[in-house]
Amino acid sequence: MKSTLRISLKSGERIFVNGAVLRVDRKVAVEFLNDVTFLLENHVLQPEDATTPLRQLYFIAQMILINPEGAEQSTAMFRKSIVMLLACFKNEEVLAELKRIDGLVTQGRAFEALKAIRGLYPIEERILNNQEITPATIDQIRKEIAPWR
């Protein structure tokens, strides 16, 4: 990190820092003075909300950050999921971004990968609404990923 990073948290808000969960009891500003892996509570996707292929990928990628002890298992599942998604999506923009996201995770930049995945949600919604990916394919992806959660 070239400069410090300052974030503000509201009373009761949680933040995930290097695998630990912290909750603040009052409004506070936190300044990170060195490299840190963190995820704000409002960016944490709950398992029951991982209802689409990209949201499932997001859930897996966030586990790399939230659970450092299980990062190896999460990364393996991420790789398996990326391969499946690259085979399912036909949209060139999505395919190019998935390849970039895979590179980010490979480089240890899972936080940036999460932001990129969130950026694909509107395109995914359009694809799913137009049934450019068949419901059977989506069900297959869910079956592959669901046991891991």
Swiss-Prot record:
Keyword entries, A-Z: Bacterial flagellum biogenesis, Repressor, RNA-binding
InterPro entries: Flagellum_FlbT
Sequence similarity: Belongs to the FlbT family.
One Gene Ontology biological process: bacterial-type flagellum organization
NCBIfam families linked to this entry: PRK00794.1-1
Function per UniProt: Has a post-transcriptional repressor function in flagellum biogenesis. Associates with the 5'-UTR of fljK mRNA and promotes its degradation.
Name of the protein described by the UniProt record: Probable flagellum biosynthesis repressor protein FlbT
A UniProt-annotated Pfam family: FlbT
Gene: flbT
Gene Ontology molecular function: any one: mRNA 5'-UTR binding
Keyword Nuclease appears in the UniProt entry: no
